[in-house]
Amino acid sequence: DIGADLILVFDECTPFHVNKTYTESSMRRSHRWATRSLNRFNSSIKYKPTYGSAGEQKLYGIVQGGIYEDLREESIDFNLNKINTFGIAIGGSLGSSKEEMYEVVNFTAPKLGNKNPIHLLGIGDPTDIWKLVKSGIDTFDCVSPTRLARHGSALIKGKIGKKNIKNNEYSNDLSPI
């Protein structure tokens, strides 16, 4: 009963170092799971949150394919033409570097069009968010902002990027971050 507003089909997120054969097998498995997830979501037993939610849940499909453009193309086609979800997430391995991640996102996002919201999985660095919104990404999720907050850091605008609010200089500071 977490009351999530946006939920995702079940998938496998492959690590960046797996080969194309494994990535393709994983993508096909994720597509089968997506179909099962959608069928369950649309079933008469559909989960209806009672609290913690702004309303009806929305299901997102997930584009897989790792760094391989032909696999991404196939997964884009699956998500746009074989299943019908509220939105589409870009998932799976986005590469082993920021450059590869930007290449994968900039290849994938424009092909998804603007009919559905586009979500990017696992990216939470503020610089990446600003850059990737310009590429057509609507929403993001990542554990890093929450993890930083648990350890006393707050993300802030500007070159510094974050501030450790546990530092002694802030112990009596009641001003806005």
Give the positions of each predicted feature.
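Non-catalytic, usually N-terminal nucleic-acid engagement modules in DNA/RNA processing proteins
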Residues: 1-53, 168-169, 177
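Glycine-rich phosphate/ribose-binding loops and adjacent secondary-structure elements
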Residues: 28-31, 44, 48, 54, ...
